[in-house]
Amino acid sequence: MGPVQKEQTREQVVARLISMLHQAHAMGAELVVYPELALTTFFPRWFVDDITQADHWYERNMPNAATQPLFDEAKRLGVGFCLGYAHLDERSDGTVHRWNVQTLVERDGSIVATYRKTHIPGHEHHEPDRPFQHAERYYFEPSPDGFGVSCAFGGIVGMAICNDRRWPETYRVMGLQGVELVLIGYNTPIHYVPDPSQDILQGFHNALVMQSGAYQNGTWVVGVAKGGVEEGVDSLCQSMIVAPSGQIVAQTLTSDDEVIVARCDLDWCAKYKDTLFDFDKYRRPEVYGRITSQRGAVLPD
């Protein structure tokens, strides 16, 4: 998906999403995956002292008046979709939570699941020396739920968001639940402020982590970018569909709204799950204790 500028309304963005839905349907797609924070610009690039001044970037309900046309048209066409957005979770006890989420919708229009982002990157406080902010840790809480999967679209489907894709635990936790299709939306600035030497490697790293996650868990991975120049910040494009073999079977070529399609044969997953990555036969969880017992590295004496 191409950039969403600050002045664009949700209604304008939803019209773009519906246009891509029509293109995908004409190409035979049964499931359309949209990127992280698809309905708005990537607002964590700005910092506001009063976080409630950013509430207009969040959705309180899904669907809502702006997104209902997408839900209606998808149901009419018999096409499911996965949509990323910011969720303002106002609870009856008066607490307010802010999540970065993806909602998976089946072909009949029913909501299958909503996933909350687990690995929140960036910083919590204003860093005025940056050319732009990446204040996700200010605007979003990390998920308390982790990585679940759902039976949908004739298989076992899981979700992840942006920075989640860089962590092998993301794929493995879902792999241990038999996942066959992982849906990932992302916004990735090409300029990485903490270490600009990584800028030139953004595309390489993007493919590396999704191809590795697919292969090592015998699953399809669909990674979808909101890329291009958005409010002066250039973000990675390179949406791709990765097979359980780790091979890229389709990839976007532009920084505009673009639709790619692949036939994802879920039976292909068994070629890896039942052989080299037969978890029950080959895994050694008794020696993996450090993965869950500690957070940071503990160096040897």
Segments the model singles out, each with a brief description of its role:
Residues 104-106, 242-243, 262-263:
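Short beta-strand-to-turn element immediately C-terminal to the catalytic PLP-Schiff-base lysine
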